[in-house]
Amino acid sequence: NLVQFSNMIQCANHGSRPSLAYADYGCYCSAGGSGTPVDELDRCCKTHDDCYARATKSYSCTPYWTLYSWQCIEKTPTCDSKTGCQRFVCDCDATAAKCFAKAPYNKENYNIDPKKRCQ
């Protein structure tokens, strides 16, 4: 779920940036999403959105509210859930959190005007 995803982000980036810094970034790191991702970090968010869409389609679940089991092992989010929607959503979140940790954060892409930048 969103709280677990936030905690995974903190695990992967070692607490270097608050999770909310990603909540209104680029074209895809917020509710909805459209157009071309503005950079590598925004591509991480688009991939995460696409992963959640696959979870919804494949498992008829609601990824934003799905609880799963995971651990932060050596600063790496690691999924414990074994099957179905829980595992799929956990993998989506863990992959995105690791992607966020590797991608540069460009302050000019925070809180952009999607009507101008997300065509």
Swiss-Prot record:
InterPro entries: PLipase_A2 (IPR001211), PLipase_A2_Asp_AS (IPR033112), PLipase_A2_dom (IPR016090), PLipase_A2_dom_sf (IPR036444), PLipase_A2_His_AS (IPR033113). GO terms for molecular function: calcium ion binding; calcium-dependent phospholipase A2 activity; phospholipid binding. The keyword Disulfide bond applies. Keywords: Disulfide bond, Secreted. Residues 107-117 are annotated as: Important for membrane-damaging activities in eukaryotes and bacteria. One of its GO terms (biological process) is arachidonate secretion. Disulfide bonds join 11-72, 27-118, 29-45, 44-99, 51-92, 61-85, 79-90. Belongs to the phospholipase A2 family. Group I subfamily. D49 sub-subfamily. This is Basic phospholipase A2 homolog 1. It comes from Notechis scutatus scutatus.
